Regions:
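Transmembrane-helix signature of 12-pass secondary carriers
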Residues: 1-369
């Protein structure tokens, strides 16, 4: 919020790549954990700032599609990382994956010289001439590629003046406080279930149902592949359906197959796969689009901060998921785990239904003054 989107992106990518290189030369578990922790700082800085940047460059009418097709690359990258690790690690060792992790450093130079700073951030900092140059450059590029520029829509007059970077205190003010709590509930609930399922189901297939390793891995790849298709459908339709309606429907829908697993006893691997997969896919459309919604519910001065603090609840939910699984399974049965996840999905869906504002088709300044 203080020095700009692109400088922070360059720094974060540099930290990530440098710590990838350091991990190659780790001399023990403690040093590897320390380097991975520092690498996580790079990732944690890059993702919310990049999401704010893309949000601020998106037009109101198709912002959801534009942003989520960008976010889809993240899911493709996760799938590709698993495939690359499967192929490389047995032959080249675990260090080879950190060599791959150094590749993003190649983005730093083009990032600084071929991309423009967010015009919304420039305006917010009072750098109007620079913002005008960026906007003119974008308009000229669109015209060169044969695109027609839509007529500007009339909006209420807004006094444009430089504003200081936002603060955590403002995030809990009268306007943004309820939005902050809503987003934190969504981040926590959706990621608690999805990351819980993602990490637990392969172990479940192996230890409870005694499936061969290759079959358990195959179930996992199939589940993530179906979730990838669901995410693409979400990207193409969320602007028409609307954020509030999509999130409510996805969360409440996910609770149905999860609760069905409890009722039926989750007694076979086919049953678990057939019912957990649609729930996971529905929730995946929520988790991967929350950076979009977070960026829409905060103004420019709070956008990166809000997304960053919101994603901290992503980590909290991801930690809570396996812990809840262990706690609930202490009775010896796996079925109550699915009931617990169903209850969390339903409760989060009702929270969204009651308190989530609709943002589709509206300019960011209209949504968050």
């Amino acid at each position: 919020e203080r020095i700009g989107r692109l400088p922070v992106l360059a720094i974060a990518i540099g930290i990530f790549a440098a710590m990838s290189a350091a991990c190659i030369f780790a001399w023990g578990p403690a040093s590897l954990i320390a380097f991975r922790f520092l690498q996580g700082i790079g990732t944690g800085g890059e993702v919310p700032v990049a999401s704010a940047y893309v949000n601020e460059l998106s037009g109101a009418r198709k912002r959801g599609r534009f942003f989520l097709l960008y976010e889809l690359l993240f899911l493709v990258g996760l799938t590709a990382a698993g495939a690359i690790g499967y192929l490389m690690v047995p032959k080249l060792g675990w260090q080879s994956m950190f060599i791959v992790g150094m590749v993003p450093v190649a983005l730093v130079v083009p990032l600084r010289f071929f991309l423009s700073e967010s015009p919304r951030w420039l305006i917010n900092r009072g750098r109007f001439a620079e913002a005008d140059k960026v906007i003119c450059r974008l308009e000229n590029s669109a015209i060169r590629h044969g695109q027609e520029l839509p007529e500007p829509k009339p909006t209420a007059a807004v006094l444009v003046q430089p504003k200081p970077a936002g603060s955590v205190k403002e995030m809990f003010g009268p306007l943004y406080g309820p939005r902050t709590l809503l987003l934190w509930a969504m981040w926590f609930g959706a990621y608690m279930i999805n990351n819980g399922l993602l990490t637990w189901l392969p172990t479940l297939y192996r230890t409870v149902f005694d499936l061969p390793v290759d079959q358990a891995i195959g179930y996992g790849f199939a589940m993530t592949g179906i979730a990838l298709v669901a995410s693409f459908i979400c990207a193409m339709t969320i602007d028409k359906v609307g954020r509030r309606r999509w999130y409510t429907g996805a969360l409440l829908f996910a609770s149905i197959p999860l609760s069905t697993l409890y009722v039926l006893g989750a007694s076979t691997p086919i049953m678990v796969f057939a019912l957990a997969t649609p729930a996971f896919a529905a929730l995946q459309t929520v988790t991967y689009s929350l950076y979009l919604y977070s960026g829409e519910l905060y103004p420019t001065r709070l956008r990166s901060l809000g997304a960053g603090l919101g994603s901290a609840w992503l980590r909290a939910g991801s930690i809570a998921g396996p812990w809840v699984i262990g706690l609930v399974m202490s009775g010896g049965s796996i079925a109550p785990v699915f009931l617990t996840f169903a209850a969390v999905a339903a409760l989060t869906g009702l929270v969204v239904l009651r308190w989530a504002p609709e943002t589709s088709g509206k300019a960011l300044e209209e949504l968050s003054p």
